[in-house]
Amino acid sequence: MASYQGETLPDEILSLICQELGNDRDFGSLFKCALSSQSFADPALRTLYQLHQFSPAFEQRDDMEFKQRPGDYATKHAEHAQFFRRWTVLWRSITLSSLDDDVTYKPYCRYIKTLDFRNLSLMLEDMNFTGTIRTAFFAGRLRPFHFPKTEYKRQVVDIVATVNAIGDAVTAKTTLLEEIDGHISPGFLPRWISRSPRLETMVLWKGDALINGAGEAIAENCENFKNLTLHEWMSPNADELFAAFLTELKPDTLTYFEMISFNNIGKLSFGALGRHRKLQQLELGNLNEDAVRNLNALKGCTSIHTLKLDDNYGTVRIEELNNDVFLEVVEWLSSCTELRDLSLKKFFDGPALLSRVLHSPNVKLTRLSLEGYTVRNVNAQLFHSALADQKSLESVWLKGNGEDTTPDDLQIMVEGLCNLTNLRELALKDVSDEFTEEHIIALALSLPLLEDFWTSGGEVSADILPPLAQLKHLKNLTLYAMTQFHSNQIMEYLMSLDAVNQKGFTLSLMAADPDFDLTEDTQDMIREYIRANLDGRFDFVLWREAELSDSEDD
């Protein structure tokens, strides 16, 4: 067989090696490759900067490791300072490379696909970005990028002005740019977009960055643009401005849109979203009352695969006070034949909407989440009954008020869930507070494919463990019920699990009956068994401790 006899490997092979190291996120080896030879430097540095946003220096993800590592304070402080300096060197090299082709060894900014100005802002505002580190960052050719200001009688960096200046310089050279993230001032983004023909995604802190022609710039220059995330947009005219931006875009541009936090978008924006018939994922958080009253304006979005709607207040009664709107929303959701993942949070009429939509033969969900409803309610009963019509469901997440329920309320809920034999994930948070062990047993016997089971409840004995042991795919079991398990019963349950299929198993008893407390030695013994035999974890909290915790954060 012929073999390659040259002194160095072909460039194609070197590039493939670097690509594989990049896929493995092995930045240490890539850096060594860059230092090893001139022929290796180009593909190694290209890969390093293409993926720089995943590097430890960029994410500063080893920061806690330095603090926890054994050693004296001076050594750890020096290691931490060196690690932080790598972060500043990364951003300095990116910025310098945008000035002239010969300022840096390679034109690093030309390799970049993602510009995350959130990360740059975090670095500039970090308490370690002072003194010699700040001076070194802005030294030489970067002096024009230093915008100092006085804040509380001390000199700091004007982060907004600095980010704008660096962004203006870098985007002039980032010809491969696919994503722009960060808090960007109004007026800058259209120019940056026009320089980025490969742009696909933007993640912006405030929607105001989109004004003054960002939509037109995308329409004229960015054929691949499709994803937009906004953190907030509280301007009084946000609805009009966002609708104008969406109208500036070519029809069917967006496939993904997410509004994360507080905003004032509403009817006009919803109607403009309907122009984008390829929109597959729509997530609208913290909707105001006017927006909820105009949800029917979203009826043009019929290709939705994932829909998440969050009512900021939870007080709007559209079924009672705006029934025409309510019926239009039901009709819209029922017509979305591609809808697979549906989430409603704090909607007063959430159960009423779902009780009708779930009956639609056009809707075949795989994931469903409802948060912020009351179980003791006629519409809740209708919703729980309607669950049985969605046998394609693989994940159900329910959270609400489970107090003062009747036996019928709980029985209807359990019966509806027991029909979902394809379920892999079931989370019942607070809605199941008055579950008995019979309810938990019924679910365990009816849902053989469960992998993740989270439920609250009243007092439950070890009688629930044998049925739970029949769940051969279960990987996570979290019980916020008042469990009454002896250590030998817990061990018997754990020993019945399959060490291969249930590897990584986690058992969390988060509200154990104080009369069934386990000593620290017993807990350690159980933890060691589950670690050694299942590579898993055991959590144990007594009820009196759980009572003081906020399960809403779990």
Where are these regions (language model features)?
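Short secondary-structure boundary micro-motifs
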Residues: 152-154, 326, 426
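N-terminal adaptor/linker regions at the entrance to substrate-recognition repeat cores
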Residues: 2-318, 337-341, 537, 554
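Structural motif corresponding to alpha-helix initiation and N-cap regions
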Residues: 98-102, 164, 186-187, 211-212, ...
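Short secondary-structure transition/capping segments
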Residues: 60-65, 320, 464-465, 488-490
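Short alpha-helix boundary/capping motifs
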Residues: 30, 34, 160, 208, ...
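Leucine-rich solenoid repeat modules
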Residues: 2-5, 12-20, 271, 281, ...
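Short, structured segments at the rim of ligand-binding sites
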Residues: 319-325, 478
